[in-house]
Amino acid sequence: MVEFKGYALTDPSAWSTLDIVSFQPKNFLDDDVELAITHCGVCGSDVHTLSQGWGSTGTLPLVVGHEIVGIVTRVGKNVEEFKVGQRVGIGAQIGSCMKCKRCKNGNENYCNDGMIDTYNSYYPDGVFAQGGYSTAIRAHQQFVFTIPEAIESKDAASMFCAGLTVYAPLRRNGVRPGTKVGVMGIGGLGHYAVLFAAAMGAEVFAFTHSASKLEDAKKMGAKHVISTHDDDFYKPYVGELDILISTIDVFRPDRPLKTYLSMLEVHGKFINVGLPDSNNPLPEMHAFDLLGGAFLGGSHIGSKDDCNAMLQLAAEKNVKPWVEELPMSRAKEAVENVKAGKVRYRYVLTQDIAPVAGA
């Protein structure tokens, strides 16, 4: 029986302690691609899951990680896009039903009938899905992506969740040169939103509560950087923005959503992509708060088309995320620092359980 190895949560009371375990991969099918993992980004989702911020982890042991780069070691007989030895990536989704209207229309990331998350999920064959803090992974070819040569593996890794999560709503909402894009929160997601919006030619407004990040946001490409410490921070920007990407916890009662909406131009869009630990309802709003013509919405990762377009843009515009590499054996340090807000702006773990040929 084939076994992979990974750094896994085994005791929920010690959420950041990850031990090396062996686990069974999914059965290999005709549309599958197997890769030996070289890099895996550390996502906020990993921390929320490990620390049970989104609820009980359930099945243990659990290997997290869904910002994966690796080298193809095996392809199914239906796979033509990928070859053994090729460098590829995998993000937060590794399967869908591939039959529903959404899947057929290029919206497989919104599949309601067969969504399979990269970890903490189950394959149709009943095997528990383990993530990328590991030696290898298998996925349906629809959820595997070719990495352009111009993008280094350490830079590509976190694009497959954090990058895609903010790029997809920018692309799908028609951001182009001159579009006024606001980014609320300059963390792992927000820094990518600034980088990609700037690469798309947008006029970027970066909003952050951290004074230390104001200069960083400028270096990332923001034309305007705004501290949100002042309660009236939004007033100079009322009616100014075409789209506002929010990466923060807008569900906290002390964060007035209606003030964010007020910064939108008529028919401007507020897109929430932040998924905090809290399960609070939306802050109090009234029908009158929407009379400015604002649209309130969300977004979930991205499709294959979105991801390929993102990678092409990153290669063409030399988009460089701010990352720090650590060996996988230091995953404990990485997840603890992410939870404490100490990372600037993404960690990427490098393989140290088993060397990868061709890496």
Model-derived features with residue positions:
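C-terminal capping/lid region of NAD(P)-dependent oxidoreductase domains
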Residues: 2-4, 215, 238, 271, ...
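Glycine-rich beta-strand-centered segment in the early N-terminal region that forms part
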Residues: 24-40, 53-104, 146-150
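Short glycine-/small-residue-rich Rossmann-like dinucleotide-binding loops
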Residues: 41, 76, 93, 230, ...
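NAD(P)H dinucleotide-binding glycine-rich loop of Rossmann-like/cofactor-binding domains
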Residues: 97-184
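Adenosine-nucleotide cofactor-binding segment
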Residues: 177-186, 198-259
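N-terminal Rossmann-fold NAD(P) dinucleotide-binding loop
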Residues: 190-191
